[in-house]
Amino acid sequence: MASQSSKPQSIYDFTVKDAKGNDVDLSIYKGKVLIIVNVASQCGLTNSNYTDLTEIYKKYKDQGLEILAFPCNQFGGQEPGSIEEIQNMVCTRFKAEYPIFDKVDVNGDNAAPLYKFLKSSKGGFFGDSIKWNFSKFLVDKEGNVVDRYSPTTTPASMEKDIKKLLGVA
């Protein structure tokens, strides 16, 4: 684990909170390809993104894909519910089997350290801020951020990149 003074080298240097408030060391995902996404329950993009995320997860979870979903209420107040309400909605309505973590800020002074790292790894065209719900980061098996996708990019359209990282033909 990286000490506080050293700069994080990969997402494995971070610990986040799960939906129950327990610490989760992201190094448990070593060897997995990850989609890290900020989610919201009341966004116009909710249905299409959650449906696609669930489908792509079912298709590739056995090959090593994991999706890490982080609820965020910073965009139009579209994630106002408690973490229990969010989990219930996602698991019941969208049959999500991937982890939903504790609610986070993705921008500003209180942004989660993981999100500060993600943004610094893949800023570029997007700048340093997350623009809206369902911004997606693709992470390789070594914990490196390899790509960033806009909220309107569907998880299904990421499939070619996901397959490449998984080594699936």
Curated annotation (Swiss-Prot):
Compartments reported by the entry: Cytoplasm
Organism per entry: Nicotiana sylvestris
Reactions it catalyzes: a hydroperoxy polyunsaturated fatty acid + 2 glutathione = a hydroxy polyunsaturated fatty acid + glutathione disulfide + H2O
Family from the record: Belongs to the glutathione peroxidase family.
GO biological process, one term: response to oxidative stress
An MF annotation (GO) of this entry: phospholipid-hydroperoxide glutathione peroxidase activity
Name the UniProt record assigns to this protein: Probable phospholipid hydroperoxide glutathione peroxidase
SUPFAM superfamilies the record matches: Thioredoxin-like
Tissue expr: Germinating seed, apex, flower, as well as in stressed tissues.
InterPro entries for the chain: Glutathione_peroxidase, GPX_AS, GPX_CS, Thioredoxin-like_sf, Thioredoxin_domain
Active site: C43
